[in-house]
Amino acid sequence: MTQSFEHLSVLLTETVAGLNIREDGIYIDGTFGRGGHSRKVLEQLGPNGRLIAIDRDPQAILAAEQFKDDSRFQIVHGGFGQLAQYVEELGLKGKIDGVLLDFGVSSPQLDDAERGFSFLRDGPLDMRMDNSQGQTAAQWIARAEIEDMAWVFKTYGEEKNSRHIARCIAADREKTPFLRTKELADLIARITKNKERNKHPATRVFQAIRIYINSELEQIDQALEGALTVLAPEGRLSVISFHSLEDRMVKRFIRRHSQGESVPHGLPITEAEINKSRKLKGIGKAIKPSAEEIERNARARSSVLRIGERLPYDLESV
């Protein structure tokens, strides 16, 4: 029997409102998950609207069956980093009215011990978003050099004790390979001296391994750049981040494309020419969940929503 896990979409109302839904518009939900954001978009679309959802998790593809009778909806099995490719294959490049991206790990993924994402539930050390392909976390840990592990923990988890943890993992795996989440989490908890308040010592390392195994930051970079190529003029980009690495990427991306290309001082160039290189404008300030939402869903606590709007200046080259 398949166990079901509840998932509450974070910043649901704010994120969909940021898309400025048109009844006959075409929208992308690049991170379908369990369909919370997609459902909200479909509620606001008219009969001629269209929603294309994307997810690389086979369980998410199964969850999309809930919309199988809605002709406005279709699901693509793949990574959100390839959204521009999928849109181009559909002949919709430059015609998308909104792109929604939610970079969080869904509650069903965290709560299902068999997926191997959680340090609070014992399960196989997997962590793959698409568990039908690619190396598992256990396979990577078994082969990775100490220097490589330390780099991953520091770069993707901002873990201060990265080298110490990497050395301890390498020493322990010589005796017994790490195959279960609890084995790795218990080791990290045991060797960590300066513990952060209200945070499990393994939090940063598990985050780092997950990001590395799934090439998450590369996927984010590709998705953001891809959104620029598929959005129609005045099309919206709504992006939810869950940790500082992701949010910095989104913030810098919107800022860079809002300012246009940098021009050497003294170069004779008009403001109109500079504006031609601007591709986005930021919409409002970063949005964080309300106290009420955090009380309902503690996993929303670290989420940040940023919204951008596609400018038309260079669309003649799209």
From Swiss-Prot:
Location(s) in or outside the cell: Cytoplasm
InterPro entries on file: RsmH, SAM-dep_MeTrfase_MraW_recog, SAM-dependent_MTases_sf
GO biological process entries: rRNA base methylation
EC number(s) recorded for this UniProt protein: 2.1.1.199
Keywords from the named record: Cytoplasm, Methyltransferase, rRNA processing, S-adenosyl-L-methionine, Transferase
GO MF term list: rRNA (cytosine-N4-)-methyltransferase activity
GO cellular component entries: cytoplasm
UniProt KW S-adenosyl-L-methionine keyword: yes
UniProt catalytic activity: cytidine(1402) in 16S rRNA + S-adenosyl-L-methionine = N(4)-methylcytidine(1402) in 16S rRNA + S-adenosyl-L-homocysteine + H(+)
Pfam family, one: Methyltransf_5
Protein family: Belongs to the methyltransferase superfamily. RsmH family.
Protein's job: Specifically methylates the N4 position of cytidine in position 1402 (C1402) of 16S rRNA.
Protein name in UniProt: Ribosomal RNA small subunit methyltransferase H
Source species: Shewanella piezotolerans (strain WP3 / JCM 13877)
